[in-house]
């Protein structure tokens, strides 16, 4: 918004020449981070008071951690604060003609809406299950598949008109069209090594990354500050990849595919980092507010979408290792319990409690120890991921 205003003012008079600073992506990214941070810090107390007044408090299940019983009633659905700060800062500082930012906003707000309905049913309607699994996965699939099909064509072409032409050409070919190498799955640490996915393969991978990341972040969001800081770290690292792939010079030098327009995602990533830090101010132990599904599902979906656009799905898998392990721990626990119950007549567990962070709590770790150690691991994983920029 401000970029368009600055460009318009420059056409009116040379006196507005100083507004050329708005053309610099790095400046707008820094301002987006600062804007989201300030908006989050200023609006945070009001949002928390409103949530408390509406009695939107976090229910704690009886079979959960005993040490978490004191958290019962803490305001939840604080993810609306994060999403508002991200959306406000992004819309203020990004180039409105950029299609990649719009699709990331679509996924973010789409998953946020799904999470909002889930939280509302749990907290307000007192339905412990919230949205049923099939219903939730259906709507997640709708958002994920729409994003997958759109990105298939928008990554391949640089203009919306060419995107539309490519879509019709794909349909006319019987869904058997050769796409540019840009949509291939890149393998980190190796020069110019990639695996062709094809159109359908790309859509399936995109769907799995977006929906998987959304649910993985949601599963991680179980302790004060546990999920939000890894989101900030991974999002910031993905912003670096977005800047590289969006630059014809840097992408050529570092042997990355050049995806025109993807650099603008740095503005969104910066806004997400600023909003995340603002939320952490209120979410750090002891938390004044919880993110809820409205925030966790949305942020996970956003990270997955950005990873797909910048063609760094495997690197995202590495940097978001905490999210991956948390999700695997839940799946392994459920599958092993069902298997042993069927075979031995009684369900057995791999972990003391799932997700993994609760296992460590049951093992004697304090909540703050689990959180900070998971942060440190995420920081190391992000550094490994960033090293793939040069170590190839």
Swiss-Prot record:
Its cofactor is Mg(2+). It holds the Pfam family Glycos_transf_4. It catalyses: UDP-N-acetyl-alpha-D-muramoyl-L-alanyl-gamma-D-glutamyl-meso-2,6-diaminopimeloyl-D-alanyl-D-alanine + di-trans,octa-cis-undecaprenyl phosphate = di-trans,octa-cis-undecaprenyl diphospho-N-acetyl-alpha-D-muramoyl-L-alanyl-D-glutamyl-meso-2,6-diaminopimeloyl-D-alanyl-D-alanine + UMP. GO terms for biological process: cell division; cell wall organization; peptidoglycan biosynthetic process; regulation of cell shape. The keyword Acyltransferase does not apply. The chain crosses the membrane at residues 28-48, 74-94, 100-120, 137-157, 193-213, 225-245, 262-282, 289-309, 314-334, 369-389. Its EC number is 2.7.8.13. Keywords: Cell cycle, Cell division, Cell inner membrane, Cell membrane, Cell shape, Cell wall biogenesis/degradation, Magnesium, Membrane, Metal-binding, Peptidoglycan synthesis, Transferase, Transmembrane, Transmembrane helix. Pathway: Cell wall biogenesis; peptidoglycan biosynthesis. It is found in: Cell inner membrane. The keyword Nucleotide-binding does not apply. One of its GO terms (cellular component) is plasma membrane. Belongs to the glycosyltransferase 4 family. MraY subfamily. Catalyzes the initial step of the lipid cycle reactions in the biosynthesis of the cell wall peptidoglycan: transfers peptidoglycan precursor phospho-MurNAc-pentapeptide from UDP-MurNAc-pentapeptide onto the lipid carrier undecaprenyl phosphate, yielding undecaprenyl-pyrophosphoryl-MurNAc-pentapeptide, known as lipid I. NCBIfam families: mraY. This is Phospho-N-acetylmuramoyl-pentapeptide-transferase. It comes from Variovorax paradoxus (strain S110). The lineage of its organism: Bacteria, Pseudomonadati, Pseudomonadota, Betaproteobacteria, Burkholderiales.
């Amino acid at each position: 918004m401000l970029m368009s205003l600055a460009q318009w003012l420059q056409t009116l008079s040379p006196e507005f020449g100083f507004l050329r600073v708005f053309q610099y992506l790095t400046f707008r990214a820094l301002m987006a981070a600062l804007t989201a941070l300030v908006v989050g810090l200023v609006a945070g107390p009001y949002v928390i008071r409103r949530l408390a007044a509406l009695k939107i408090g976090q229910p704690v299940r009886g079979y959960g951690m005993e040490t978490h019983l004191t958290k019962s009633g803490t305001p939840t659905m604080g993810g609306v604060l994060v999403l508002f700060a991200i959306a406000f800062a992004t819309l203020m500082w990004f180039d409105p003609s950029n299609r990649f930012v719009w699709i990331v906003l679509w996924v973010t707000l789409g998953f946020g809406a799904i999470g909002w309905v889930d939280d509302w049913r749990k907290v307000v309607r007192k339905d412990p299950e919230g949205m049923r699994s099939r219903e939730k996965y259906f709507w997640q699939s709708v958002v994920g598949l729409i994003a997958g099909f759109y990105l298939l064509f928008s990554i391949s072409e640089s203009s919306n008109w060419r995107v539309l032409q490519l879509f019709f050409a794909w349909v006319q070919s019987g869904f058997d069209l050769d796409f540019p190498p840009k949509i291939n799955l890149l393998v980190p640490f190796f020069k110019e090594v990639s695996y062709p996915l094809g159109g359908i393969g790309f859509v399936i991978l995109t769907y799995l990354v977006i929906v998987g990341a959304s649910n993985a972040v949601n599963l991680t969001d179980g302790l004060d500050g546990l999920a939000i800081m890894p989101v900030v770290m991974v999002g910031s690292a993905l912003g670096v990849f977005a800047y590289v792939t969006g630059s014809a010079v840097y992408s050529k030098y570092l042997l990355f595919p050049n995806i025109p327009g993807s650099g603008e995602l740095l503005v969104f990533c910066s806004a997400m980092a600023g909003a995340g830090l603002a939320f952490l101010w209120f979410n750090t132990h002891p938390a004044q507010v919880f993110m809820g599904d409205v925030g966790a599902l949305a942020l996970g979906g956003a990270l997955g979408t950005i990873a797909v656009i910048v063609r760094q799905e495997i690197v995202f898998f590495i940097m978001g290792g905490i999210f991956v392990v948390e999700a695997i721990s839940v799946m392994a626990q459920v599958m092993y319990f069902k298997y042993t119950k069927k075979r031995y007549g009684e369900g057995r567990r791999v972990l003391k409690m799932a997700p993994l962070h609760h296992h460590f709590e049951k093992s004697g770790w304090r909540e703050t120890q689990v959180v900070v150690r998971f942060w440190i691991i995420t920081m190391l994983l992000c550094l490994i991921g960033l090293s793939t920029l040069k170590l190839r």
